[in-house]
Amino acid sequence: MAFASPPASPPDEDGQARAPRYPGEDTTPTSRQEIWGWYAYGIAAEVFAVCGVGSFLPLTLEQLARERGFLQSSHLPCVGPDSPSAPKESSPAMFRRDDTNEQCVVGLMGLEINTASFAMYTFSLAVLVQALTLISFSALADYENNRKTLLVTFGFIGSATSMLFVFIAPPVFVLGALLVVVGVVCLGSSFVVLNSFLPVLVASDPSIQNSNKESAAELHRLDPEAEYVHARTSFDGDEPTHRPPTGLGLGGATGTSSPELQLSTKISSKGVGLGYCAAVFVQILSILLLFTLSKTSISKASGTLPLRFVLLLVGIWWFSFTMVSRRWLRNRPGPPLESTSTGASSHQPRWRIWLHLVAFAWKSLWKTVKIALKLREVIVFLVAWFLLSDAMATVSGTAILFARTELKMSTTMVALLSITATLSGMAGAFLWPIVSRYFGLKSNHTIMVCIALFELIPLYGMLAYIPLFKKWGVIGLQQPWEIYPLAIVHGVVSGGLSSYCRSFFGLLIPPGMEAAFYALYAATDKGSSFIGPAIVGVLIDATGQVRSGFFFIAVLIVLPIPLVWMVDAEKGRKEGLKISEDVVRGGEGEDEEVEGLLAR
């Protein structure tokens, strides 16, 4: 497959690469083609994140289980000519609403599980496995040629899982759950590896070569109003303090005047924007594909077959743009695996060195936790982030299944719902900085406003339990059209929370420990996001209604508000600065533990 290269970047001013920091480092100046290779993977994988994980995978899992399931009350098939939900009209399945209100369950390991719960449990398991994988293997990306190899491998395997859904029929619906777990793990892992490219590309960019030569290795604090874009989201904290500035999170300048920060923010923001634009484009293509298939006999053969063709399209897209990244990205190798920093000897077999890296990653994370326990403001905010990230993940998954099973919305309507939320999220990322400046809000106050608006979503859904509204048949998410305004709220709020929480946490990090603490931040995010979906799944099984999960979600969303309010950013900055100064002075006693984390 051939791809046209973007315009070549102009040569750097002095025409010389910077000095290598370890044997074998590729210090070739970053080209525009390589930057576009980095963008290409975001364009590839973000489509699976939005169109797959965020839209069609939950629908496909639920529908696969539904076509294999039976009604709990009568034990009649949920789908088929003998089902109470058998269509009375000739409209295609993806445009048709299922008006039955009986609970559909499927037998699994001797249990009767609601088909919506099956999807929730699957994604809960997928996120848990993803978190364990990220913590265990993210350190491998920093050594030898593993960075590009892992990125391409995760991309190819992940895209294959999406394409393989075309072969998953209802009798083997459990295999669909397995593909989801593998796909989600590959998606999250590949984004971690992709982020690890960013500081390398920034460090070798010709535009900052001269500034790096002239700058001193000085610690700067983060501007409260700036968005911190960390250098990498690897879960290891093995960045030595004596290394020269290589970008964000590596001990270099992190203030708004830092050339590395400005360039990294520019590249990262453009990458996110391109990824979301690609996701919206493929989502529109998916709707057109569903519409086209509705004119054929395919839609009548199986309710999941059109969905599986959409996942095939998503997988092909992911694979194709991964090929672009494979061609345009340089290897950018890291230090040799036998580096003594991993605690492994060069005489050991390769697999033992890899095991040392896995153990090293977990020990590094644990050391970071012990350091964080000394910082009250960091701990309070991480607890708030633990709850908030779980709430965000739970709302996203619950909303799709609620639209499908409770509101009986068609596949096309749900796809439009996803597009609405995605476009609103893009708008929210630009809107909240303007709102914050206009009203003079501090970062934590902006987060609290976002959470308060987020709380409106489950509260509105709970209004349907009020007899008056229930009698009206409208208000409280009883009609399909009601969910679209809430999708706008969800998108706008999510865009603000994602950026402001990361930025606010950056204020509390001890200078020079950015990589380790953002690893802890990411671990908290992924480590919590499996709890909420699992609990909602249990509630659905107990009540037979997805709506019952709104009670739990409402409590989960509101809990972080007092915690965020309690965080004193100025006190947290002083605490972080004190620990950082102890490290710079060499540390004494317990502070040697901090230094060990950064200098191993």
From Swiss-Prot:
Keyword Lipoprotein in annotation: no
Compartments where located: Vacuole membrane
Entry superkingdom: Eukaryota
Transmembrane segments: 41-61, 117-137, 149-168, 186-206, 271-291, 304-324, 378-398, 414-434, 449-469, 484-506, 526-546, 549-569
Topology class, membrane: Multi-pass membrane protein
UniProtKB keywords: Amino-acid transport, Autophagy, Glycoprotein, Membrane, Transmembrane, Transmembrane helix, Transport, Vacuole
Annotated glycan sites: N444
Disulfides per UniProt: none
Region entry Disordered, spans: 1-30, 234-257
Pfam family membership, one: ATG22
Any one of the GO CC terms: vacuolar membrane
Tagged with keyword Endoplasmic reticulum: no
Biological-process GO terms, alphabetical: amino acid transmembrane export from vacuole; autophagy
Function: Vacuolar effluxer which mediate the efflux of amino acids resulting from autophagic degradation. The release of autophagic amino acids allows the maintenance of protein synthesis and viability during nitrogen starvation.
Sequence similarity: Belongs to the ATG22 family.
Name of this protein: Autophagy-related protein 22-2
Source organism of this protein record: Aspergillus niger (strain ATCC MYA-4892 / CBS 513.88 / FGSC A1513)
